[in-house]
Amino acid sequence: MARMGGSASADIEAPVDEVWAVVEDVLIAPDWQGGVVAISALERDAEDRATLVEIENDIKVRHVKTRVRFRYEPPTVLSWIQEQGDLKSVTGSWTLEDLGDRRTRATYTLDSDPGRVLGMLIRGPVEAAVRAALVNARPGELKARVESQGR
């Protein structure tokens, strides 16, 4: 296995600013993103947002740690790139689209290269399970988090 990733979207019954408030608060990810075990801020910007974080993820075959640098483009794009970690490379983003009528489309994109050793562990059905957890599930998790806060 070389690269792993993909893109998935969900339409959320909330305005873009409410969705952005959850997306940009990266330190609460363990509260609503499955597989995110821990996250801690190593650097912050002038607006006190975490810009460099260490993340521990449970990717089914083992726990992996990565240091990720975030770039904020409020209120529609949060992107990241791995600077150091157990994986060979990771890039990703959340892109929010205002659909009007207090609705937002959230698209999650992830591209990762687990490297040779970890890649040998992630094959076949395991690869499908990892992709489902790390990519396909994310928009639904965000939808559930945002819509539950609006109640």
Locate each region found by the language model:
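Short strand-connecting beta-turns/loops that link adjacent beta-strands
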Residues: P15, A46-D48, P75, L99-R103
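Hydrophobic ligand-binding cavity/cleft-lining segments
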Residues: M1-D48
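Hydrophobic pocket/interface hotspot
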Residues: E18-V23, A29, V53, A106-Y108, ...
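Short amphipathic alpha-helical segments
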Residues: P15-E18, V130, L134, R138
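A structural signal for short, well-ordered beta-strand segments
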Residues: G6-I12, I55, W94, Y108-L110
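Glycine-rich portal/gate segments that line the openings of hydrophobic small-molecule binding cavities
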Residues: P30, S40-Q84, N136-R151
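Short, surface-exposed coil-to-beta transition loops
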Residues: G5-S7, H63-R67, K88-S93
